[in-house]
UniProtKB/Swiss-Prot annotation:
Residue ranges annotated as propeptide in the record: 1-29
Crosslink position(s): Lanthionine (Cys-Ser): 30-31
Domain of life per record: Bacteria
Name of the protein in question: Lantibiotic lacticin 3147 A1
Cross-link (Beta-methyllanthionine (Thr-Cys)) at residue(s): 49-54, 51-58
Sorted UniProt keywords: Antibiotic, Antimicrobial, Bacteriocin, Lantibiotic, Plasmid, Secreted, Thioether bond
Post-translational modification (record): Maturation of lantibiotics involves the enzymatic conversion of Thr, and Ser into dehydrated AA and the formation of thioether bonds with cysteine. This is followed by membrane translocation and cleavage of the modified precursor. It is not established whether the 2,3-didehydrobutyrines are the E- or Z-isomers. In the NMR model they were assumed to be the Z-isomer.
Role this protein plays: Lanthionine-containing peptide antibiotic (lantibiotic) active on Gram-positive bacteria. The bactericidal activity of lantibiotics is based on depolarization of energized bacterial cytoplasmic membranes, initiated by the formation of aqueous transmembrane pores. When present individually lacticin 3147 A1 exhibits strong activity towards L.lactis strain AM2, weak activity towards L.lactis strain HP and no activity towards L.lactis strain IFPL359, but when combined with lacticin 3147 A2 it displays strong activity towards all three strains.
GO biological process, one term: defense response to Gram-positive bacterium
Modified residues (2,3-didehydroalanine (Ser)): 36
Organism: Lactococcus lactis subsp. lactis
C-alpha cells in the first residue's frame, strides 16, 4: 500500500464520531451522556440505547 492509498481510505463510523465535539456542535450547553443523547433522539426514558433510538422494529 502506498502513501496515496493510505490517505484516501474511507473514514470509519467510529473515527467520524470520535472527531466530533457533541457538547458544542449538537447539544449546546448539555454534557454528552446517555441521558442527553436519549432526549435528543426522542426517548423519554432514562437510557440511550441503540435498540430504542436506531432500530424501528424495537420502538
Amino acid at each position: 500500500m502506498n502513501k496515496n492509498e493510505i490517505e484516501t481510505q474511507p473514514v470509519t463510523w467510529l473515527e467520524e464520531v470520535s472527531d466530533q465535539n457533541f457538547d458544542e456542535d449538537v447539544f449546546g450547553a448539555c454534557s454528552t451522556n446517555t441521558f442527553s443523547l436519549s432526549d435528543y433522539w426522542g426517548n423519554n426514558g432514562a437510557w440511550c440505547t441503540l435498540t430504542h433510538e436506531c432500530m424501528a422494529w424495537c420502538k
